[in-house]
């Protein structure tokens, strides 16, 4: 709407005229009853929501307000204010933070606010996070809050984002589905942005490797946090993972692998189902330049594009990041061209051209062997082809989705996602992102047949349908029927809701 554009232009002009403007950080805490957080039925009848009261004093409250005034959180609050403006909120809402008692780290929408003896429903979003003085002092609050409020931005701008079908617990190095990858990747990139622009000396020391602890970095969640930063900076997630040796479940070892083969690329479907890859794209788009008000300004076209994407009919097979590139190009050709260039650079051109992907892999093989005679001329040739393909993609961003293929989901009748260790959901397999270990879990597929299917997918393109997969697999009638049964089971189960 023209009026909305004028309001946002005035907001940005005011921000750029001085220090970054930020909204209020409202602090909430749960009402405790019988040693547990009080919950009450939502007005729409869809489950329960927290009953909360506002915090307005105390040492922790003051430390949070100081962070909101002078830390990087100030910039995130300004971005939340921008997200509200772009989403069309005429009055502006408070950026709410709920002080979780345990197991925090969520973006939630809707809660009961108790004021005096009365409770009223607020259909507003909040970050649910465990916070203490130490987490504020060492910068971990600043970083994790940036991640969680990134989810809030998407709830405001892209509320129609569909749920995905993957049941795999998400990590920066996991391959799930495009919906989860966009949601988590967008939030994750703000952690790297927080590291880029923080002034917290302890977080800077940790980032530089000057503040550290032995042993605890080896824990899964700490590995994940580290890869959300370094993996994004080094563009690791575009590469194929290597399953480490071990006696543990083969699929689990593959999905939790933190080892990447820098001479092998993921296929386009795997890239866009990787939150680490999406995080890298968003980070590279936003990180170049000054922080503060300039950073807020850089996000405005992207926020507009997310809102435009929300107006489209989004489905399971919508290639979300390429669709976002199209939306951004439609609003601003210059910003769209820059986003497409980031996509091309980050994917080594694989999203637009399988030939470019193959040339990048060949170049990597000669490069890591130090073969200058082969590397230098190949580099010159591949750069020329990349420039041509990038120009073509900028002129027609839809081509970035042409090599992804459909999402062909199967629900395994007995195996659990990640072996059932972190959740009890059945294993879901997308045939166009599946690796050797996943295929070998299917009826009639041994190691040799799995390798042939992967080679066929790489050489002849993504599987166009279940029928196409079964034809290439050449399975017995009984095994083919079992796989069709797994397809039907997934249709019956439907998408997988995540917190």
Language model features with spans:
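Residue-level signature of tetratricopeptide-repeat
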Residues: 449, 454-466
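Small-residue hinge/turn detector
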Residues: 446-449, 476
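Auxiliary, metal-adjacent structural segments of Zn-dependent hydrolase domains
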Residues: 62-130, 134-138, 142
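Acidic/polar low-complexity interaction segments
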Residues: 23-78
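Alpha-helical interaction/regulatory segments in DNA maintenance proteins
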Residues: 412, 416-420, 470-499
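Active-site recognition of the HExxH zinc-binding catalytic motif
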Residues: 143-160, 184-188, 192
């Amino acid at each position: 709407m023209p009026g909305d554009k004028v309001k946002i232009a005035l907001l940005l002009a005011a921000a750029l005229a001085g220090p970054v403007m930020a909204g209020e950080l409202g602090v909430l805490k749960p009402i405790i009853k019988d040693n547990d957080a009080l919950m009450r039925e939502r007005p729409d009848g869809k489950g329960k929501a927290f009953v909360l009261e506002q915090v307005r004093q105390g040492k922790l409250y003051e430390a949070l307000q100081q962070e909101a005034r002078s830390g990087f959180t100030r910039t995130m609050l300004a971005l939340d204010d921008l997200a509200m403006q772009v989403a069309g909120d005429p009055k502006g809402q408070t950026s709410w933070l709920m002080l979780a008692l345990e197991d925090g780290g969520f973006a939630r929408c809707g809660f009961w606010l108790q004021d005096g003896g009365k409770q009223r429903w607020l259909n507003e979003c909040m970050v649910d996070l465990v916070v203490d003085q130490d987490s504020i002092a060492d910068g971990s609050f600043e970083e994790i809050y940036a991640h969680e409020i990134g989810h809030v931005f998407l709830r405001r701008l892209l509320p129609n984002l569909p749920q995905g079908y993957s049941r795999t617990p998400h990590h920066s190095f996991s391959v799930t589905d495009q919906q989860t990858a966009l949601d988590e990747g967008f939030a994750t990139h703000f952690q790297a942005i927080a590291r880029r622009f923080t002034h917290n000396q302890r977080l800077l020391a940790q980032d530089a490797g000057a503040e550290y602890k032995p042993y605890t970095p080896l824990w899964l969640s700490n590995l994940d946090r580290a890869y959300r930063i370094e993996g994004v900076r080094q563009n690791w997630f575009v590469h194929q993972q290597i399953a480490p040796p071990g006696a543990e479940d083969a699929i689990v070892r593959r999905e939790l692998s933190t080892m990447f083969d820098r001479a092998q690329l993921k296929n386009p479907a795997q890239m866009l189902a990787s939150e680490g890859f999406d995080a890298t794209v968003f980070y590279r788009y936003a990180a170049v330049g000054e922080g503060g008000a300039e950073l807020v300004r850089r996000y405005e076209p992207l926020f507009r594009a997310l809102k435009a994407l929300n107006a489209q009919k989004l489905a399971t097979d919508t290639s979300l990041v390429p669709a976002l590139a199209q939306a951004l190009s439609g609003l601003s050709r210059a910003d769209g061209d820059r986003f497409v260039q980031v996509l091309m650079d980050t994917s080594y051109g694989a999203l637009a051209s399988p030939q470019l992907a193959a040339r990048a892999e060949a170049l990597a093989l000669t490069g890591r062997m130090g073969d200058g005679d082969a590397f230098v001329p190949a580099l010159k040739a591949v750069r020329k082809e990349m420039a041509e393909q990038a120009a073509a993609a900028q002129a027609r961003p839809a081509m970035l989705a042409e090599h992804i293929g459909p999402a062909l989901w199967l629900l395994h009748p007995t195996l659990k996602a990640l072996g059932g260790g972190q959740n009890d959901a059945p294993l879901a397999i997308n045939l166009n992102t599946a690796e050797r270990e996943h295929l070998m879990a299917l009826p009639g597929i041994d190691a040799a047949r799995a390798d042939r299917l992967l080679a066929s997918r790489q050489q002849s393109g993504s599987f166009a349908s279940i029928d196409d997969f079964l034809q290439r697999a050449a399975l017995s009638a009984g095994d083919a029927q079992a796989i069709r049964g797994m397809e039907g089971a997934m249709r019956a189960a439907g998408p997988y809701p995540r917190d």
